[in-house]
């Protein structure tokens, strides 16, 4: 699966699966640390991305790697590359 997918100019993100209810679709929450310009304190930002999971292999709680890809549907522009850590 991941051999056929290339990341030419897109971004790669690591996040946790928060939903797998749709067919061949997962929702991944990605956390980033951003430094506040005034307080000089790091703040945790979270964003959700819908990604294409062609084999329906992800479950809620899995840590996954996704890459930017051509649009699959209206909201899906990310593709699952690998499962880094399975949920317990």
From Swiss-Prot:
Highest classification ranks of the organism: Bacteria, Pseudomonadati, Thermodesulfobacteriota, Desulfovibrionia, Desulfovibrionales
- Gene it is expressed from: rpsQ
Q: How does it assemble?
A: Part of the 30S ribosomal subunit.
Please give the superkingdom of this protein's source: Bacteria
An example Pfam family from this entry, by short name, is Ribosomal_S17
Stated family: Belongs to the universal ribosomal protein uS17 family.
Keyword Ribosomal protein found: yes
Q: Which NCBIfam families match?
A: PRK05610.1, uS17_bact
Give UniProt keywords alphabetically: Ribonucleoprotein, Ribosomal protein, RNA-binding, rRNA-binding
Q: Name one GO molecular function term.
A: structural constituent of ribosome
Instruction: Record the organism.
Output: Oleidesulfovibrio alaskensis (strain ATCC BAA-1058 / DSM 17464 / G20)
Q: What's this protein's name? A: Small ribosomal subunit protein uS17
Functional note: One of the primary rRNA binding proteins, it binds specifically to the 5'-end of 16S ribosomal RNA.
Per the UniProt entry, the signal peptide is none
